[in-house]
Amino acid sequence: MQPTVIETWPAPAKLNLFLYITGQRQDGYHLLQTLFQFLDYGDTLTIRPRNDDQINLLTPIDGVENEQNLIIRAARLLQQHCERRNIRPAQFGANIHIEKCLPMGGGLGGGSSNAATVLVALNHLWQSGLNVDTLAELGLQLGADVPVFIRGYAAFAEGIGEQLTPANPPEKWYLVAHPSISIATPLIFGDPELTRNSPVRDLETLLNQTFVNDCEAIARKRFREVEQLLSWLLEYAPARLTGTGACVFAEFDTEFAARQVLDQAPEWLNGFVARGVNVSPLQRRLSGQR
């Protein structure tokens, strides 16, 4: 049976509604507790299968070599996995076009989301038949955040981010602002002043406390642009860093309230308004919803 032909696939952004660093493993990876929620906003990938095994990214991303791009790496990883298991679809290549909206180094999970979308979409288009657990295991080879995008549901994450428990935080509206800089994750996680000993708590406890991002103090101290953005946003609503930055977000109960603040934003602020959603737009697309 032929799959429903879907060419256009969302690669949504995520927010870390809170992020606590609880320790560090001997291999250098940080242990954390974080709450992931998706946004109804992100990149868009157009994917068309090919009858050969060529993987072509038709819209290269500035500053990223194709061979290092998570889009290409994800497609080839899926190819290799299928070949090892003697799964050889008639169409085993792809032409991929990306409409890039999410900033690099922004803490919105753009690269991880792109990788997840490629794995999910090509599994569908190639009729590979892999289940979500297998796709998530493949995704983890590409990055700790990839599995949550593959599974497609808001989640409480522990470990290095790969231990996921479904969660259902309020679906608020957010003004997400980007300071026109990129922050590489190793810069924050490698900072000697980063808090690495937050206490481990259960989700119920964390949901009833003020949400905090342990990376925020470092980002504000090291990057004046982040400090400037947060100082402005905090005049209007609760606001904090997502991931290791550089993006920050303020939360609102209505779209109107969020847009009112965006309309007052100074010229140097780059931002957008989006709704937090607990079911990923990618999951909705796969299940036939819009």
UniProtKB/Swiss-Prot annotation:
Annotated GO MF terms: 4-(cytidine 5'-diphospho)-2-C-methyl-D-erythritol kinase activity; ATP binding
One GO biological process term: isopentenyl diphosphate biosynthetic process, methylerythritol 4-phosphate pathway
Keyword Nucleotide-binding: yes
Catalytic site positions: 14, 145
Catalytic activity: 4-CDP-2-C-methyl-D-erythritol + ATP = 4-CDP-2-C-methyl-D-erythritol 2-phosphate + ADP + H(+)
Top-level taxonomic group: Bacteria
Job description of the protein: Catalyzes the phosphorylation of the position 2 hydroxy group of 4-diphosphocytidyl-2C-methyl-D-erythritol.
Descriptive protein name: 4-diphosphocytidyl-2-C-methyl-D-erythritol kinase
